UniProtKB/Swiss-Prot annotation:
Positions of region (Disordered): 56-85, 166-190
Annotated protein name in UniProt: Large ribosomal subunit protein eL19
Localization in the cell: Cytoplasm
Keywords linked to the UniProt accession: Cytoplasm, Ribonucleoprotein, Ribosomal protein
Keyword Ribonucleoprotein (UniProt): yes
Compositionally skewed regions (Basic and acidic residues) per UniProt: 166-184
PROSITE patterns: RIBOSOMAL_L19E
GO molecular function, one term: RNA binding
Length: 190
């Protein structure tokens, strides 16, 4: 049997695959052995004496099944973990996610007019200082802050009304006293 190593190499180069993907017809060895140029190899490839082997199938079904199973929480126990907790899910990434959520909510509330710019600024700083664990706690804080502001406003208005009332009563009392004094002076003069 002729040595067809060169022909196999040339065929691989012509077809554009590796040598292991080239099939040479064992019944046509003499014809293949005579082909010593790329053009001759190309002709043999066209007439089917030299064939490109098909791709070997690498099934991904097992990989897909494993991925699905991991999504359900299997194969994720302590024995399967290689990196540290921070390497697997960096705390920096978690922090960034959380802060972006909080800041987006604050901006939305400010633009909608639910909070004023002063409260926005205070809450922005508080969020940066790790005051709020999640969105719900921030919303609850906003609701509480607004309720407190309303209560303070009502108390201020009440106090102001009381001050006005007291001032009016004081003025009336002074007026009455002045009138009494005048009446007494007028009586004494007669």
């Amino acid at each position: 049997m002729a040595n067809l190593r060169t022909q196999k190499r040339l065929a691989a180069s012509v077809i554009g695959v590796g040598k292991r993907k080239v099939w040479l017809d064992p019944n046509e060895t003499t014809e293949i052995a005579n082909a010593n140029s790329r053009s001759a190899i190309r002709k043999l490839y066209k007439n089917g004496t030299i064939v490109k082997k098909p791709e070997t199938v690498h099934s991904r079904s097992r990989a897909r099944a494993l991925k699905e199973s991991k999504r359900a929480g299997r194969h994720m126990g302590y024995g399967k973990r290689k990196g540290t907790k921070d390497a697997r899910m960096p705390s920096q990434v978690l922090w960034m996610r959380r802060l972006r959520v909080l800041r987006k909510l604050l901006a939305k509330y400010r633009d909608a007019g639910k909070i004023d710019k002063h409260l926005y600024h205070n809450l922005y700083k508080a969020a940066k200082g790790n005051t709020f664990k999640h969105k719900r706690s921030l919303v609850e804080h906003i609701i509480a802050a607004k309720a407190e502001a309303l209560r303070e406003k009502a108390l201020k208005e009440e106090a102001e009304a009381r001050r006005v009332r007291n001032r009016a009563a004081r003025e009336r009392r002074q007026q009455r006293l002045a009138e009494k004094k005048e009446a007494l002076f007028a009586e004494a003069a007669n």
